[in-house]
Every structure is written in structure tokens, then in C-alpha cells.
């Protein structure tokens, strides 16, 4: 994967998280508290400055009251795993 492709992925996921957060009526501070993350971390993820791990996506999804596949449909196969734990 090229750096350009990696950045495009970070941008896409960041934009999706920001959109879902706003639709949920949450501030970055509220989401960060719910997800157990620093507000600056959420801000940088939304800006596409950080590559996110699956654990972070799971924490954000839980903070939003959603499953990981809502954030990134490519993770649809992993959503049932969270339900089992």
C-alpha cells in the first residue's frame, strides 16, 4: 500500500467518524470520554493524521453506540466477534 493510499484510508475513516459523531450529537470531548481516549487523539483521527488500530475503532464504535462495520464496512466480518465477547 502506498503512502497516498494509506492517507486516503485515514482521511476516509476520519471523515466517517466525524460524521457519525456529529449525527449522534456528540462533541469530540464527549466521544473521547465514552471511548476512553484523549480528545486530541479523536481530533487527530478525524483529521486523518493518525492511522487507527482495530482496538481504537472498536472503542470509538462503542462510544458511538455502534458496531465497527458502521464506521468501516470493510470490517463487517469483525462485528460479530465483538458480540461474542
Show which residues each predicted segment covers:
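A short, Lys/Arg-rich alpha-helix, primarily the initiator
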Residues: 1-23
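Short basic helix-loop element that most often maps to the first helix and adjoining turn
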Residues: 15-34, 59, 85
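Conserved hydrophobic/aromatic packing and binding residues within compact polymer-binding modules
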Residues: 17, 31-32, 42-45, 71
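Acidic-residue sensor for enzyme active/binding pockets
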Residues: 28-29, 46, 55
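Recognition helix of helix-turn-helix/homeodomain-like DNA-binding domains
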Residues: 36-51
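DNA major-groove recognition helix of helix-turn-helix/homeodomain DNA-binding modules
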Residues: 53-70
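Short, charged recognition helix plus adjacent turn
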Residues: 70-85
Amino acid at each position: 500500500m502506498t503512502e497516498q493510499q494509506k492517507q486516503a484510508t485515514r482521511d476516509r475513516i476520519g471523515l466517517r467518524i466525524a460524521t457519525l459523531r456529529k449525527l449522534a450529537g456528540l462533541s469530540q470531548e464527549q466521544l473521547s470520554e465514552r471511548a476512553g481516549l484523549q480528545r486530541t487523539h479523536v481530533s487527530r483521527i478525524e483529521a486523518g493524521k493518525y492511522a487507527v488500530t482495530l482496538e481504537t475503532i472498536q472503542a470509538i464504535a462503542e462510544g458511538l453506540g455502534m458496531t465497527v462495520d458502521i464506521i468501516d464496512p470493510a470490517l463487517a466480518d469483525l462485528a460479530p466477534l465483538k458480540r461474542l465477547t
